Amino acid sequence: MRANQPVFRDRNGLAAASTYQAVIDAERQPELFSNAGGIRPDQPALPMMIDMDDPAHLLRRKLVNAGFTRKRVKDKEASIAALCDTLIDAVCERGECDFVRDLAAPLPMAVIGDMLGVRPEQRDMFLRWSDDLVTFLSSHVSQEDFQITMDAFAAYNDFTRATIAARRADPTDDLVSVLVSSEVDGERLSDDELVMETLLILIGGDETTRHTLSGGTEQLLRNRDQWDLLQRDPSLLPGAIEEMLRWTAPVKNMCRVLTADTEFHGTALCAGEKMMLLFESANFDEAVFCEPEKFDVQRNPNSHLAFGFGTHFCLGNQLARLELSLMTERVLRRLPDLRLVADDSVLPLRPANFVSGLESMPVVFTPSPPLG
């Protein structure tokens, strides 16, 4: 497909860019490939910055970026490290767990939840909301799933508006307080905008990190030489994290809307139609990545597109990398003989075609005492 038709049409006529170069070329021309028509193939734009073009997108991004500065992310390192150890403490004596349910899912939800003013006892509720809301962003949503999503959004909306009001009255040091007070060129976020941008942060910060952590760890366990290599040389961890991101590509695709007729990588495209960017396919492009089907923690260079490219490059990439690094380092050190319950098993995936990853990953290891 990538070699013969870099931009192809599926059976429904939807155009899709499958090669690394085609995806990059589209992202370098936001004036031709617009976000403003919505990033899903069969849904209109939502009032959040991911569905905007500059200058509106740039202003919104500057306002939200106040909560994701390098210093603010660095300041969270100690608390995230402690959280990783707490999660491992909860399972280390058992000798078995579900890696997704017990480690990969709770970590990003706790981190993002803390930033959004979520108390520990509310995290499971937020995790359900996040899962239900992501389901809506997949194509072909049933009426039942649509209602579940609407109920989740209504509950999230009520919670977030109450949190916003509380932070306006009595600011703390959490992300909601930062966003409430953020100002660029005299502009501030309205309550409606705060609800939508924190929702984007919730979805973007929860499922993506969860799926990279679980899917990347699966590859380390299925490629035992790579696991052993990391244990012998922990300095290779940064490269391993990048390979986990390339391999899992948790955001599978996004759409752009054509603003004019054009021919693009051999395919005629019409103004007003959508073209899908296949990030996962681009991350396995043989023209860019040597032996792309090989999981290699020493891969260099590794210019993957897990965080996108261009003006919409993922704002939370530093936070995601920090979470992935801190948890993976601790899993390697504290659960050194971690292994899949069944090496030859096919693990279940979440039924989604936008943000997707492992639903469950049973693992076993030698029991050990908790740190706490």
UniProtKB/Swiss-Prot annotation:
Taxonomy, superkingdom: Bacteria
Gene3D superfamilies noted in UniProt: Cytochrome P450 (1.10.630.10)
Keywords from the named record: Cholesterol metabolism, Heme, Iron, Lipid degradation, Lipid metabolism, Metal-binding, Monooxygenase, NADP, Oxidoreductase, Steroid metabolism, Sterol metabolism, Virulence
One Pfam family named in its UniProt record: p450
PROSITE patterns for the chain: CYTOCHROME_P450
Enzyme class, first EC level, given as a word: oxidoreductase
Residue ranges crossing the lipid bilayer per the database entry: none
Pathway named in the protein's UniProt entry: Steroid metabolism; cholesterol degradation
Cofactor: heme
Alphabetized GO MF terms: cholest-4-en-3-one 26-monooxygenase activity; cholesterol 26-hydroxylase activity; heme binding; iron ion binding
Enzyme Commission number(s) of this protein: 1.14.15.28
PANTHER family assigned to the protein according to its UniProt record, in alphabetical order: BIOTIN BIOSYNTHESIS CYTOCHROME P450, P450, PUTATIVE (EUROFUNG)-RELATED
Family: Belongs to the cytochrome P450 family.
Function: Involved in the utilization of cholesterol as the sole carbon and energy source by degrading the side chain during infection. Primarily catalyzes the sequential oxidation of the terminal methyl of cholest-4-en-3-one into (25R)-26-hydroxycholest-4-en-3-one (alcohol), (25R)-26-oxocholest-4-en-3-one (aldehyde), to finally yield the carboxylic acid (25R)-3-oxocholest-4-en-26-oate. Also able to sequentially oxidize cholesterol itself, not only cholest-4-en-3-one.
Protein name from the UniProt record: Steroid C26-monooxygenase
Naturally occurring in which organism (per UniProt): Mycobacterium tuberculosis (strain CDC 1551 / Oshkosh)
Source lineage: Bacteria, Bacillati, Actinomycetota, Actinomycetes, Mycobacteriales
